[in-house]
């Protein structure tokens, strides 16, 4: 309850596209969708399919779209493919829907490098998954996201999915990160533990 109230208080005055949100509304509300990254039969990114998806999202009443999350298979795309995908989504949904960009790495140095080098024009926030495979301590998780926040030009959504990463962001670490920076604006909580949301 208190974390949700804190997040709402930090985002209430954040101004984004006025055609979607009125002043004093939270940055992202309603129903969002994590988009797939469509490919054609030859293994190339299907740009026309991205356009059709975006139109479907918009007409269907979706509130915001996550690009290059787990569903978008960002971990299997190379840098060039990611740039192509980013630009296509931005062009297709410009002045229509807010976009969240997934940027993640289990290396803090690499994550910061990716954030600093990625063209985030057209995106409203970055979503970054908890460091995976290495099973960091809670202090390690805090330092990972702290460094990302310090270099990021955009607000950051934490992404907790221990079933895939084998690491779990504790409630205390979430609160600590939220207290550290107003750029931490929320979390995608995919642990499946509903009591954590209630707490």
Regions found by a protein language model. Give the residues of each.
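Generic secretory/membrane-interface signal
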Residues: 7, 34, 182-183
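Active-site beta->alpha loop and helix N-cap motifs at the rims of alpha/beta catalytic domains
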Residues: 17, 21-29, 33, 38-166
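Catalytic alpha/beta core domains of metabolic enzymes, predominantly
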Residues: 164-199
